[in-house]
Amino acid sequence: MNNFAKRIIPCLDVNNGRVVKGVNFVNLIDAGDPVEVAKIYNDSGADELCFLDITASFENRDTIVEVVRNVASELFIPLTVGGGIRKIDDISRLLEAGCDKVSINSAAIKNPNFIDEAAKKFGSQCIVVAIDAKKTDQGYHVFINGGRVDTKIDVFSWSKEVENRGCGEILLTSMDRDGTKSGFDNYLTGKVSKSLGIPVIASGGAGCMEHIRDTFLAGADAALAASIFHFGEIKIDDLKRYLRTQNIEVRL
């Protein structure tokens, strides 16, 4: 299989070591158990898995390391973990526990040198920069703190900067589309993707198979979604067969 196959990535929110926002699979014994959920996705054709650690309290940060350790032993597809990663030590611990990539967001904005340091120490292939984009009167801006704070930084110049600093991939979320199921922001995805030499993961807005096809046609290298997969609205193997009929290269 060539390296240009498009990737499908389910995303799970993990809070204090438990999957939240419900996962609705018929054959799932415990929908809150990350290991159970990861195994199902591993076996159902997902290309990668993404965990977003939304644990609020710092004292519980150790839980995500344990989760990664437990999940990694059962998982044969790459695992990316994001949420609250602020220090080189955070990355070391997660990679040692068995995760393949880490996703950094607010910390990259607050200290852009963190990207350079992380890429230099662990290699670009491990470092994903998550960009939460929202349309404003002044154009697309980068938002942080869960989409609450407008940094006033232009998304297109920031994505170029993080590439230059050594990140290996961008996770680009449209805050406007997130949760709407009305389709990805393909203008945003396409413009970022065409300006960069690194892969772009599109996120925010997936509601049907056509939406995922359209974001790939716009230039996304991977599509990330949550509820449409978790609630069984779209089965990944069905999605991949559909994409094949649309002449989009995927791994079956």
Swiss-Prot record:
The active site is at residues 13, 132. It catalyses: 5-[(5-phospho-1-deoxy-D-ribulos-1-ylimino)methylamino]-1-(5-phospho-beta-D-ribosyl)imidazole-4-carboxamide + L-glutamine = D-erythro-1-(imidazol-4-yl)glycerol 3-phosphate + 5-amino-1-(5-phospho-beta-D-ribosyl)imidazole-4-carboxamide + L-glutamate + H(+). Signal peptide: none annotated. Pfam families: His_biosynth. Its EC number is 4.3.2.10. GO terms for molecular function: imidazoleglycerol-phosphate synthase activity; lyase activity. It comes from the Bacteria. Its main location: cytoplasm. PANTHER family: IMIDAZOLE GLYCEROL PHOSPHATE SYNTHASE HISHF, IMIDAZOLE GLYCEROL PHOSPHATE SYNTHASE SUBUNIT HISF/H IGP SYNTHASE SUBUNIT HISF/H. Belongs to the HisA/HisF family. IGPS catalyzes the conversion of PRFAR and glutamine to IGP, AICAR and glutamate. The HisF subunit catalyzes the cyclization activity that produces IGP and AICAR from PRFAR using the ammonia provided by the HisH subunit. This is Imidazole glycerol phosphate synthase subunit HisF.
